[in-house]
């Protein structure tokens, strides 16, 4: 069996990798969806709304199964596990991030955009340089919480059947009980490592929230 420290470090590294890559996909998709939701062009709004409602309403586990087994079976393609995780978690995350960003964009006073437009600045430039940066400051706490949720949801990758080098923390904890003959230790260690990731993120979210509240007064 693999050595205990090596396996847990692989699991930790993979969990962080799955979380970060899926968050990047979710953030990019969320920005596009949020702008579509706020668009004056009806079809964009309807398409984005349908996407958001679908992926917020379907369990992430089903999305994993769809991209891990359904799509490869239907189209005869085979994706590496990291790609499946990045796409599946990223698409689910994009739906939640889109709603968070939409709320943040709507919280920026309209006068900011109107002032920029009155100075002759194009709408897209005003959005990129003035509105979106302010919106991001508003939504930093919920975005940090989204990273925490992604960290925990990355554990769903176990349903895809992993090679040892693809293990994340939960898979390590689950298989380690029997493979390493170490009792409950693998589960406890996996839980501890999750806390090492999520507790600092939670504290960071609170700090962002406190700073945002202070600036609001």
Language model region names:
Residues 1-217:
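Transmembrane alpha-helices and adjacent helix-loop boundaries
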